[in-house]
């Protein structure tokens, strides 16, 4: 009996302590003028609930506090914004103190000179360097031919096989990007680079705890290995004096390039290019295959578009820019896939000083999470939003609307948007004109915090001509 009473006393004490901690944390952040919301536990905040409940966490918060509220997620005090017009203001006003606020693990692993980490004049310079190697002219003359050649080869031997389309699109996104960056030399560095790159990606999505066997430690080590691979490639190119028609060759042209980067900046920019395109291109391609399988009328329409292109060409003729421009329905499929699957959940900003926003005080150093998932499913913005309907993007000017944040927004809109669309469009062109496919079944999809098939997404592929 005495033991029972002692245990009961300890439990009551713990309950009181927990209640006091929660109350103290709320009082600590109850400054005059802050948006409504709750801060959860000290240190951990509401991160556990956010990751566990996912979209339901945000829905419940929105129902209780509205479209602009405070929380404590991802390791720091955070304001969550789901208001389309306010989101546009936040993303358009970096100069007013709303700078990128990405997690520390991402900044550490992608490098101090990566385009997501810098702002002001440095960001303008690095973005200019990036845009100079993915301009419409270079996409037309150099990058698209490489993409076409790669996709033809990558999709060559899928007939009569059961494949994991998740793994195939991951390989596709990585290897296609590497070919554009390093040209002919990409084949010699692909395998060691890819092994380390996948570790790097995991590290950016982890807590910044630098202990053995953590994803964060693995990401930091992977970064060192990738720097070694790229540094060796840069030195070999400097020694050879050969002309290389690829992204790396453009970046290394000191005399002809107005954006003169040192080796460290070039390496960080290459890692940024690889990282930025990898997740969006691979996951959008996988989910497009999934949605096309589930919606036969959409598949019929996209096949009609691509067979019309093939009828104008000889079998060996590559895709060119005029073909890309004619892929209006394919572009709509890509946008609708990105919207419905919500490949990117939101964008993070950080305040550089105390400021007023939407009538509330936002303290210096707080994160602002422009949460786009709920906007993608807003029935006032998208009719019947949970239905996969690419036709909604044809002739409705949705791409020019302020709530269109699938590729980011404001001064940080994804500079590689058109290049990514070109890669996915070319992949879909050869996939739907060469093959039929059916799902093997039993594979599950998770859509939060990332879109992923934990056990893969397996499909049985056969030749379309059969």
Swiss-Prot record:
The chain crosses the membrane at residues 2-22. It is found in: Membrane. Heme binds at residue 414. The keyword NAD does not apply. Pfam families: p450 (PF00067). Its cofactor is heme. Its EC number is 1.14.14.-. Catalyzes the C6-oxidation step in brassinosteroids biosynthesis. This is Cytochrome P450 85A.
């Amino acid at each position: 009996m005495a033991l029972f009473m002692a245990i009961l006393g300890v439990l009551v004490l713990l309950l009181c302590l927990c209640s006091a901690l929660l109350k103290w944390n709320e009082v600590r952040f109850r400054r005059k003028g802050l948006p409504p919301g709750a801060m959860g536990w000290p240190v951990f905040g509401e991160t556990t609930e956010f990751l566990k409940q996912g979209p339901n966490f945000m829905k419940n918060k929105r129902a209780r506090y509205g479209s602009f509220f405070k929380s404590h997620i991802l390791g720091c005090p955070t304001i969550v914004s789901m208001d389309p017009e306010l989101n546009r203001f936040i993303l358009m006003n970096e100069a007013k103190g709303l700078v990128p606020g990405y997690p520390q693990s991402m900044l550490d692993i992608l490098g101090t000179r990566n385009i997501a980490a810098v702002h002001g004049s440095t960001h303008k310079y690095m973005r200019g360097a990036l845009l100079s190697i993915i301009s419409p002219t270079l996409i037309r003359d150099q990058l698209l031919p490489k993409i076409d050649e790669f996709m033809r080869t990558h999709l060559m031997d899928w007939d009569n096989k059961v494949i994991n389309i998740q793994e195939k699109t991951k390989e596709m996104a990585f290897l296609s990007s590497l070919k554009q960056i390093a040209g002919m030399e990409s084949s010699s560095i692909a395998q060691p680079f890819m092994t380390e790159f996948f570790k790097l990606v995991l590290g950016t999505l982890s807590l910044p705890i630098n202990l053995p066997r953590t994803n964060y430690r693995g990401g930091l080590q992977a970064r060192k290995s990738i720097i070694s691979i790229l540094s060796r490639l840069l030195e070999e190119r400097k020694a050879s004096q050969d002309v290389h028609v690829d992204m790396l060759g453009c970046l290394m042209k000191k005399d002809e390039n107005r954006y003169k980067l040192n080796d460290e900046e070039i390496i960080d920019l290459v890692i940024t290019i690889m990282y930025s395109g990898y997740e969006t291109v691979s996951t959008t391609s996988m989910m497009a295959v999934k949605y096309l399988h589930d919606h036969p009328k959409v598949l019929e329409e996209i096949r009609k578009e691509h067979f019309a292109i093939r009828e104008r060409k000889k079998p060996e003729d590559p895709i060119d820019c005029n073909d890309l421009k004619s892929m209006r329905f394919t572009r709509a499929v890509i946008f609708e896939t990105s919207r419905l699957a919500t490949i990117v959940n939101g964008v993070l900003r950080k305040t550089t000083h105390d400021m007023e926003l939407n009538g509330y005080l936002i303290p210096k150093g707080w994160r602002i999470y422009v949460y786009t998932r709920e906007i993608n499913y807003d029935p006032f913005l998208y009719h019947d939003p949970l239905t996969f309907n690419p036709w909604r993007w044809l002739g409705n000017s949705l791409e020019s609307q302020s709530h269109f944040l699938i590729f980011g927004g404001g001064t940080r809109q994804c500079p590689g948007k058109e290049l990514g669309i070109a890669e996915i469009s070319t992949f879909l062109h050869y996939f739907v004109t060469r093959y039929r496919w059916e799902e093997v079944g039993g594979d599950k999809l998770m859509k939060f915090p990332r879109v992923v098939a934990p056990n893969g997404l397996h499909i049985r592929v056969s030749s379309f001509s059969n």
